[in-house]
Every structure is written in structure tokens, then in C-alpha cells.
């Protein structure tokens, strides 16, 4: 399913349907280490590697989906799939 939206490990387009978008966001969220705080510039750099075209929307979707949280320019992972 994700192959339709990715090429060579990068996002080429975001799914329109929220359910598909959540699957893609879950994969992206795994780029962030649980328990670590990231400056906004770090988050932007990581997300640009995934989707250079519109990393700002990608960041907003991660927050809206409850996978990242933010405060005062800092972000941390709060959701998505975690490996035990």
C-alpha cells in the first residue's frame, strides 16, 4: 500500500484518505527516538529526508495524529508503533 506513495524510501505524495495517511505517518514517526526531545530544526531535517516537497505539512500531520507532541519549539514522539 505504501509503495503507491513512496519511491526509494522517500514520500512522493501524501495519501488523501486519513486511514492511509496514518499508516504512512506511523512509518515516518519511527524516525524519532522515543524519550528524546528534538529541536524544530532537527525535526525539519528528518522530515525533509522523507518529504522534501512539504515537510511542514508532514510535521503538522504527525502532531495532529498524536504521534509527535510539541512545546516551545521542541518536539518528542508520543505515538505510533514502538518496538519492544
Question: Each PLM stretch: what is its role?
Answer:
Residues 74-84:
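Short, cationic-aromatic polyanion-contact patches
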Residues 20-21, 46-47, 76:
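Hydrophobic alpha-helical segments that drive targeting, anchoring, or assembly
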Residues 50-61:
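Short amphipathic alpha-helical interaction segments
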Residues 26-29, 44, 48:
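Amphipathic alpha-helical segments within well-ordered protein domains
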Residues 1-34:
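Short alpha-helical segments that sit at the start of domains
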Residues 34-47:
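Short acidic, hydrophobic short linear motifs in intrinsically disordered regions
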Residues 64-73:
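A short, conserved structural fragment
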Amino acid at each position: 500500500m505504501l509503495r503507491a506513495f513512496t519511491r526509494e524510501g522517500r514520500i512522493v505524495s501524501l495519501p488523501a484518505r486519513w486511514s492511509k495517511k496514518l499508516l504512512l505517518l506511523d512509518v515516518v514517526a519511527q524516525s524519532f527516538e522515543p524519550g528524546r526531545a528534538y529541536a524544530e530544526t532537527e525535526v525539519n531535517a528528518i522530515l525533509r529526508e522523507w518529504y522534501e516537497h512539504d515537510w511542514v505539512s508532514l510535521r503538522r500531520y504527525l502532531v495532529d495524529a498524536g504521534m509527535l507532541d510539541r512545546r516551545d519549539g521542541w518536539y518528542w514522539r508520543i505515538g505510533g508503533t514502538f518496538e519492544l
